[in-house]
């Protein structure tokens, strides 16, 4: 039995805590809202982020980070990307032994454009890190909470570490594959949020299935293009954390990014959308980070650039569609030296 603390009591952190508890592990969950932690402990529900789902009685919630981390050997980080450094800086003052650091957040750090595993390795001393592992894939918290069949990927530099996390989570409704491509897995999970925003805009504008299919397909091309430039394996983007996550995020009403894009397509401002959502929409921050990365690394990402102009430069969504459709003629298939 593993002693594991989930850092972050949002919908995804809560759902993953359920999986771990169902597997018989000693599970704690930490959140910074005492009233929510009390509700989890007394009513066995997280009514704010995962309403209607009864949580296992073995999950213990804490609002004290120090108490939540007593004697743990594994932590699972599920917090917004912008909060990582603050949380990690607190944690490194509490943790005293090397532990496994798993993260299940899908984003790129604002300002630095770094992957979350890079942030962890920068903030946590090497003496406190046993392994850093990423857990990602097409997975809505609402469906995991209902024990609906879900499949994700565990990625780490050491395959033994990825397999260890696979063993932690795998059960009859939650299947885990392994992948050594931590760069590709992280980028696929983060960048698909950009395309989900664009797909939501397309649906909000009523552009139809043809346009949405094109956005998803060409969007995957952009993800793979930047991912390969940053060291990811092109094949990863055809897997669960690339194509798989893109499909589920672009087509489901559970997707925050799709819902946010849908509101933008219907004429709402970004400020109205973010206020209405009440939860983190990682795609907004990721669009900015990816646009900066693309310019820095000279990678062509036209959908990302068009969305960036809508979100941050006030461009009209209909004009953005026109600019994409009117681009110079191109070949569809690009030669990838690694594969050809």
Curated annotation (Swiss-Prot):
EC number(s) reported in the record: 1.1.1.94
Record: residues binding NADPH: 11-12, 33, 106, 141, 256, 280, 282
GO MF assignments: glycerol-3-phosphate dehydrogenase [NAD(P)+] activity; NAD binding
Residues that coordinate or bind sn-glycerol 3-phosphate: 106, 137, 139, 192, 245, 255-257
Catalyzed reaction equations: sn-glycerol 3-phosphate + NAD(+) = dihydroxyacetone phosphate + NADH + H(+); sn-glycerol 3-phosphate + NADP(+) = dihydroxyacetone phosphate + NADPH + H(+)
Enzyme class: oxidoreductase
InterPro entries on file: 6-PGluconate_DH-like_C_sf, 6PGD_dom2, G3P_DH_NAD-dep, G3P_DH_NAD-dep_C, G3P_DH_NAD-dep_N, NAD(P)-bd_dom_sf
Statement: the UniProt record of this protein carries the keyword Nucleotide-binding: yes
GO cellular component terms attached to this protein's record: cytosol
Pfam family, one: NAD_Gly3P_dh_C
Any Gene Ontology biological process: glycerol-3-phosphate catabolic process
Annotated catalytic residues: 192
Primary location recorded for the protein, binned into one broad class: cytoplasm
Listed pathway(s): Membrane lipid metabolism; glycerophospholipid metabolism
Subcellular location: Cytoplasm
Function in brief: Catalyzes the reduction of the glycolytic intermediate dihydroxyacetone phosphate (DHAP) to sn-glycerol 3-phosphate (G3P), the key precursor for phospholipid synthesis.
Stated family: Belongs to the NAD-dependent glycerol-3-phosphate dehydrogenase family.
PANTHER family: GLYCEROL-3-PHOSPHATE DEHYDROGENASE, GLYCEROL-3-PHOSPHATE DEHYDROGENASE [NAD(+)] 2, CHLOROPLASTIC
Protein name: Glycerol-3-phosphate dehydrogenase [NAD(P)+]
Lineage of producing organism: Bacteria, Bacillati, Bacillota, Bacilli, Bacillales
């Amino acid at each position: 039995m593993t002693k594991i603390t989930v850092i972050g009591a949002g919908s995804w952190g809560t759902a993953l805590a359920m999986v771990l508890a169902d597997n018989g592990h000693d599970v704690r969950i930490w959140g910074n809202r005492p009233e929510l932690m009390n509700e989890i402990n007394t009513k066995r529900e997280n009514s704010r982020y995962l309403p209607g789902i009864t949580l296992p009685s073995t999950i213990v919630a804490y609002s004290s980070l120090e108490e939540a981390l007593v004697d743990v050997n594994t932590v699972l980080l599920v917090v917004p990307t912008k909060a990582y450094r603050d949380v990690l800086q607190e944690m490194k003052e509490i943790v005293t032994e090397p532990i496994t650091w798993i993260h299940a957040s899908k984003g790129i750090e604002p300002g630095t454009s770094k992957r979350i595993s890079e942030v962890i390795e920068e903030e946590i001393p090497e003496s406190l890190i046993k392994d850093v592992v990423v857990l990602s894939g097409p997975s809505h918290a609402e469906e995991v909470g209902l024990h609906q069949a879900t499949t994700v990927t565990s990625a780490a530099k050491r395959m033994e570490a990825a397999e260890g996390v696979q063993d932690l989570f795998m059960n009859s409704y939650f299947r885990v594959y392994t992948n050594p491509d931590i760069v590709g897995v992280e980028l696929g999970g983060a960048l698909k949020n950009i395309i989900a925003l664009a797909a939501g805009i397309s649906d909000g504008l009523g552009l139809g299935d043809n346009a949405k299919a094109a956005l998803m397909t060409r969007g995957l091309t952009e993800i793979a293009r930047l991912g390969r430039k940053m060291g990811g394996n092109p094949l990863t983007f055809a897997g669960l954390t690339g194509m798989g996550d893109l499909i589920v995020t672009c087509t489901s009403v559970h997707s925050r990014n799709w819902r946010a894009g849908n509101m933008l397509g219907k004429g709402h401002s970004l400020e109205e959308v973010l206020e209405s959502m009440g939860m983190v929409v990682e795609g907004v921050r990721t669009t900015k980070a990816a646009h900066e990365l693309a310019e820095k690394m000279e990678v062509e990402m036209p959908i990302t650039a068009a969305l960036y102009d809508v979100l941050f430069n006030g461009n009209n969504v209909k004009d953005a569609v026109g600019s994409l459709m009117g681009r110079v003629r191109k070949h569809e298939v690009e030669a990838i030296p690694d594969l050809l």
